Amino acid sequence: MAANAEPRRRPGVGVGVVVLSCEHPRCVLLGKRKGSFGAGSFQLPGGHLEFGETWEECAQRETWEEAGLHLKNVCFASVVNSFVEKENYHYVTILMKGEVDMTHDSEPRNMEPEKNESWEWVPWEEFPPLDQLFWALRCLKEQGYDPFKEDLNHLEGYRGEHLERTTKTP
C-alpha cells in the first residue's frame, strides 16, 4: 500500500435480536439508544459478533447482557446491509428471532443504562416511524419482515440495497 493511500475500510458484523414473549402477544422488545451513535433511535437487543461465536450464541449473549433475558427457540430471521456514508457507518447485521424462556425472569431489565434508556414491549404493527428506528431495524421493517410469520419471503430478491450514499461509488 502506498504511504499516502487510505486504509481499506470494512463493514462491521452485528447481530440483532427480535425478542418475543408469550406474555406480550404480537409484541417485540424495543429499547431507545442513548449516549452513542444513533442516540434517540429505537433498537433491538444486539451487538457485535465475537470472534468464533455462532449467531445463536451472540443473540443469547447480547439479550442477556442488555436486557437480562434468557431466550429459547432462537432462529435466523433475516440479514440486512446498512450503509450510511455521511455517518461513516456500514454494518451487515444478522437478525435472529427468539422467545423469552419463561423458566427464568420474563421481564426485561435495563442492564446497560449508559447505552439504553429502557426496554418495552411494543406491538409490531404500532412501531415508531422508520426514521426513528436504528439502521438495522429500519432495514428489517423496509424488507417487509413479519416476526409472526414463519416464511422468509421478505428476502426474495434482496441484494443488500439498503444503502444511503452521498456520492456514487464506481
UniProtKB/Swiss-Prot annotation:
Physiological role: May catalyze the hydrolysis of nucleoside triphosphates including dGTP, dTTP, dCTP, their oxidized forms like 8-oxo-dGTP and the prodrug thiopurine derivatives 6-thio-dGTP and 6-thio-GTP. Could also catalyze the hydrolysis of some nucleoside diphosphate derivatives. Hydrolyzes oxidized nucleosides triphosphates like 8-oxo-dGTP in vitro, but the specificity and efficiency towards these substrates are low. Therefore, the potential in vivo sanitizing role of this enzyme, that would consist in removing oxidatively damaged forms of nucleosides to prevent their incorporation into DNA, is unclear.
Residue ranges, annotated region (Interaction with PCNA): 75-163
Catalytic activity, reaction form: a ribonucleoside 5'-triphosphate + H2O = a ribonucleoside 5'-phosphate + diphosphate + H(+); a 2'-deoxyribonucleoside 5'-triphosphate + H2O = a 2'-deoxyribonucleoside 5'-phosphate + diphosphate + H(+); a 5'-end CoA-ribonucleoside in mRNA + H2O = a 5'-end phospho-adenosine-phospho-ribonucleoside in mRNA + (R)-4'-phosphopantetheine + 2 H(+)
InterPro entries: Nudix_hydrolase, NUDIX_hydrolase-like_dom_sf, NUDIX_hydrolase_CS, NUDIX_hydrolase_dom
Family named by the database record: Belongs to the Nudix hydrolase family.
Reported induction: Progressive reduction of protein levels after 4 month of age in the hippocampus of SAMP8 mouse, a mouse with early aging syndrome and reduced ability of learning and memory.
Enzyme type, top EC level: hydrolase
Record-linked SUPFAM superfamilies: Nudix
Comment field (misc): Has the ability to complement a mutation of mutT in E.coli and thereby completely suppress the increased frequency of spontaneous mutations.
Name used for this protein in its record: Nucleotide triphosphate diphosphatase NUDT15
PROSITE patterns, sorted: NUDIX, NUDIX_BOX
The keyword S-adenosyl-L-methionine belongs to this UniProt entry's keyword annotation: no
GO molecular function terms listed in the Swiss-Prot or TrEMBL record: 8-oxo-7,8-dihydrodeoxyguanosine triphosphate pyrophosphatase activity; 8-oxo-7,8-dihydroguanosine triphosphate pyrophosphatase activity; metal ion binding
Cofactor: Mg(2+); Mn(2+)
UniProt keyword terms in alphabetical order: Hydrolase, Magnesium, Manganese, Metal-binding
Organism per entry: Mus musculus (Mouse)
Ranges where the Nudix hydrolase domain occurs: 8-144
A Pfam family assignment: NUDIX
